[in-house]
């Protein structure tokens, strides 16, 4: 089913899908991580609950692989995520007076270097999130751990998902030519 307006740009389509997910009850970080997950399929050291979170959501929608650096805001949180390939620049500075500057380039604002508490670069598959209500930067790992424990994703996968190799084999019935013609005539 198509959930986006025709003749829209990729960015506009992304916005519409993110809004759809958010308006139907998911938090904005949850919605964005559904759309731009980190590279989880071959990450053997990933915690199982986080892997289950990504695996479950992969059954609902295909990842939007970039190259993309996407910023978002819901009025309470502002953040950015870099796709799993990491081909877009995404840098941030945090000042001693708790301002956050996020941009694709360094030097977009004239900031005295002595006022910079720390600098960073958003890494592939990682989310940079500022909680405006709490006045803090949310750790990527803590955010994803919290989201991955909101529902029993692993149980749902084990209970409901089947691999094609596990399905029973059947013989293919080939109808006779005349019966196909009769069925076709009945539906005309």
Question: Residue locations for each model-derived region?
Answer:
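Conserved short alpha-helical segments that host acidic/polar catalytic motifs at enzyme active sites
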Residues: 3-185
């Amino acid at each position: 089913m198509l959930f986006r307006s025709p003749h829209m740009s990729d960015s506009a389509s992304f916005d519409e899908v993110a809004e759809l997910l958010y308006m139907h009850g998911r938090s904005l970080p949850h919605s964005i991580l559904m759309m731009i997950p980190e590279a989880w399929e071959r990450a053997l050291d990933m915690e199982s609950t986080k892997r289950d979170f990504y695996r479950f959501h992969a059954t609902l929608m295909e990842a939007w692989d970039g190259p993309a650096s996407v910023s978002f805001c819901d009025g309470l949180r502002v953040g950015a995520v870099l796709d799993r390939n990491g081909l877009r620049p995404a840098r941030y500075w945090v000042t001693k007076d708790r301002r956050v500057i996020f941009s694709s380039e360094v030097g977009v604002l004239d900031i005295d270097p002595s006022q910079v508490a720390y600098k960073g670069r958003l890494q592939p598959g990682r989310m940079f999130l500022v909680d405006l209500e709490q006045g803090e930067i949310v750790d990527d790992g803590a955010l994803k751990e919290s989201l991955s424990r909101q529902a029993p994703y692993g149980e749902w996968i084990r209970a409901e998902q089947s691999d094609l190799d596990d399905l029973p084999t059947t013989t293919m019935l080939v109808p006779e030519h005349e019966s196909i013609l009769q069925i076709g005539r009945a539906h005309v």
